[in-house]
């Protein structure tokens, strides 16, 4: 008489045949060890360079990520030109740092010229980048963009090779992103391993390196505080913006802007201190009377205008 095995409804059935192999968990690019990331970065650079005898542009900003891609280009042994596009409003010491690393300094126009022609850039109108640094020099470019820098970049950049079109003539540039999947910890460790000397602003008074520090244009409206910390630390920067903003205000019709604002001082205050125009309008024109934005700026930053 054969023996029967009684199974409950939720018992697992006996396995028949060979057991299935467990799927190995796929490692995300960000989770790979640094050695593997370096290997991939060097392969990408050498592959990109093999397509042409012309040099590749290493887009250098003076920041830590720029130092990393410059070192990778050297390690890869490729033909390149490291180029810093001088915005004229980067932190002090940036040009000196570029010169110490053998980087070409190039300038198309100054930030003062941009303000005089177009007014103050803000979070919604970031025309300054296109005017000062987003333009074609060579057909191919290496850039230090990383997905871990922001959610916006993580969504926008998926692959380490992209095509960009610069300017009104839509000039084509093939862009390579060798450290796209690197974390802050990867960058800091690579800098330590290679003995890279970064911009002085990355170090505290004791000489400790800060991997989370970020450089950028002073007063940049894309920063989380819309550049307010830069203006508070450098009141002369406020005067510089306003001096050139006055030229823009006096030499351009800008009817829509002048319908909303009474002066360039008001435009500046709205851009720096308020997210929405309605909030600005309600703040300066309230039950206690209209606020003088020029006087407010003088008092807030301790400057004469």
Predicted regions and their residues:
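ATP/NTP-dependent adenylation/nucleotidyl-transfer catalytic domains that generate, transfer
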Residues: 7, 14-23, 199, 203-305
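ATP-dependent adenylation/nucleotidyltransferase module used to activate substrates
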Residues: 2-194, 303
């Amino acid at each position: 008489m054969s023996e029967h095995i009684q199974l409950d409804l939720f018992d697992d059935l006996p396995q028949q045949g060979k057991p299935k192999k467990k799927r190995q968990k796929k490692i995300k690019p960000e989770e790979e060890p640094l050695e593997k990331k370096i290997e991939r970065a060097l392969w990408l650079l050498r592959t990109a360079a093999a397509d042409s005898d012309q040099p590749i542009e290493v887009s250098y900003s003076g920041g830590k990520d720029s130092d990393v891609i410059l070192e990778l280009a050297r390690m890869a042994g490729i033909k390149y030109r490291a180029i810093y596009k001088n915005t004229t409003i980067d932190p002090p010491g940036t040009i000196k740092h570029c010169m110490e690393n053998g980087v070409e300094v190039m300038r198309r126009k100054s930030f003062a010229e941009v303000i005089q022609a177009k007014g103050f850039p803000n979070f919604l109108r970031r025309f300054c980048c296109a005017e000062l640094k987003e333009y074609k020099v060579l057909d191919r470019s290496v850039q230090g963009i990383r997905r871990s820098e922001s959610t916006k970049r993580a969504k926008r950049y998926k692959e380490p090779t992209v095509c960009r079109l610069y300017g009104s003539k839509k000039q084509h540039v093939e862009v390579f992103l060798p450290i796209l999947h690197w974390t802050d910890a990867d960058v800091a460790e690579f800098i330590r391993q290679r003995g890279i000397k970064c911009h002085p602003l990355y170090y505290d008074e004791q000489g400790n390196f800060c991997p989370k520090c970020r450089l950028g244009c002073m007063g940049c409206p894309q920063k989380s505080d819309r550049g307010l910390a830069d203006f508070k630390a450098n009141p002369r920067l406020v005067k510089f913006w306003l001096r050139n903003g006055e030229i823009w205000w006096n030499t351009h019709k800008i009817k829509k802007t002048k319908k909303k604002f009474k002066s360039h001082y008001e435009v500046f205050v709205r851009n720096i201190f308020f997210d929405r125009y309605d909030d600005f309008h309600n703040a300066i024109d309230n039950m206690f009377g209209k606020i003088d934005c020029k006087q407010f700026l003088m008092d807030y930053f301790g400057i004469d205008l």
